[in-house]
Structure formats: structure tokens, C-alpha cells
């Protein structure tokens, strides 16, 4: 576990995204009020697939079908027990590959300078 601390939550997400992209940590978990702002910030990074999840089944599908590498939790809208279940499922689910990998291969924006 590596905490990026509190404060300007959006600024702190760039080091989190870079740590996941560079393989320093994998996968990542980010939490904010709704999860939307953090998810949008993280997904600006080309190598990040951050998934906003509030149910364990969403966390499973994010990993299995989208190979999400950062779990985003909406702190104001999720009970702590459910959040921990989401983390457990996210960390224990493998990516299925196959047709899902072909979809992921279409995600990067070429020539954007990202």
C-alpha cells in the first residue's frame, strides 16, 4: 500500500497513474466523493484504464473484460464493507483476454501526444 495523501485530490492522481503505468504498483485504487473527478483525471493517462465501481460485480467485470488497472471507489456512496469487497474482487480477478483484448487495443488515441 502506497498512500498519495490528502489535499488536492486531482493533482495527487497523476503520480498514482504514473506509478501504475511504470509498473511500480499494480493495480491501483483511488477514492473520492463521487469517484467521477478522480476517474476522469486518471483516464487522461494513455496507459490507464480506471473503472468507477460501487458493486463487486462491476469490479469483477472491469478487470475481466476491460483489464482495468485502477479501481475508483465513490467514497460518499459506498459502504466500507462493500468497498472492501470491491477491492478484494478487483485484486483477485484475472483479465479474460481474447475479444476483450481486441477492444482494449482500439482504446489508445494515436498522435495525441498523451
PLM-predicted stretches and their roles:
Residues 5, 24, 66:
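Conserved functional loop/turn residues at catalytic and ligand-binding sites
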Residues 1-10:
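Single conserved hydrophobic/aromatic residue that forms the stacking wall/gate
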Residues 30-31, 36-76:
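Mid-chain, well-packed structural core segment of small domains
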Residues 56-114:
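C-terminal binding/interaction regions
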Residues 11-34:
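Short, structured active-site "lid" loops
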